[in-house]
Curated annotation (Swiss-Prot):
This is Uncharacterized protein US25. It comes from the Viruses. The lineage of its organism: Viruses, Duplodnaviria, Heunggongvirae, Peploviricota, Herviviricetes. Residues 1-35, 59-80, 131-179 are annotated as: Disordered. Residues 23-33, 149-158 have a biased composition (Basic residues). Residues 1-10 have a biased composition (Polar residues).
Length: 179
């Protein structure tokens, strides 16, 4: 992966004390920072082991340095080669955040129900909590969360003939390896 070593290095060296204090107070799970521990569906993600503030919209991880990057407007879906910070540790409260690894995409990631996925939905996929409402009409993660339970019951009773194998395979790989 081609990544400019200037910006991540400067961000990492600028705050070594905060980094050590966060790691000491909130030890991360053993699988943090290891790409092999995630689902095989995300084999195209390259684990860099660095922490940067290149996020989508304002950085909400730490209120003391939460400055919006180029405004607070929503960013487009992830594209090839874009570096972003994946918030994997969703179980930690926002006031006591845990450090999240940084990933780089080699090629666009497509979800099982079709269409590119954004950073919030990708983080749900990494934790095995993402659900696709339908096969033909993808929705943002905010709308997907409201329709998660009824779509799951409907798919378990009468699965769709088209794409049912793809959905089943993706659900098995995500839930068996990420939880």
């Amino acid at each position: 992966a081609t990544l400019s070593a200037g910006q991540p290095a400067s961000l990492t060296e600028a705050e070594p004390n905060t980094e050590k204090a966060t790691l000491h107070r909130h030890p991360a799970p053993k699988r943090r920072g290891k790409c092999s521990d995630f689902s095989p569906s995300f084999a195209t993600l390259i684990c860099l082991g660095l922490r940067t503030d290149l996020a989508f919209g304002p950085v909400r991880r730490n209120s003391r340095r939460s400055e919006p990057l180029s405004g607070s407007q929503p960013r487009p879906p992830i594209v090839t080669g874009e570096t972003f910070e994946l918030q994997v540790h969703q179980r930690f409260p926002l006031r006591h955040p845990a450090p999240a690894p940084v990933y780089t995409l080699r090629r666009p990631v497509q979800r099982a129900c079709g269409g590119p996925i954004g950073p919030r939905e990708l983080s749900k996929w990494m934790t095995g909590t993402a659900e696709c409402p339908t096969v033909k009409s993808p929705h943002p993660p905010e709308q997907t969360a409201n329709r998660r339970t009824p779509s799951r019951v409907r798919r378990s009773r009468r699965p769709s003939p088209s794409g049912s194998l793809l959905l089943a395979t993706s659900r098995i790989s995500k839930k068996s390896t990420c939880r």
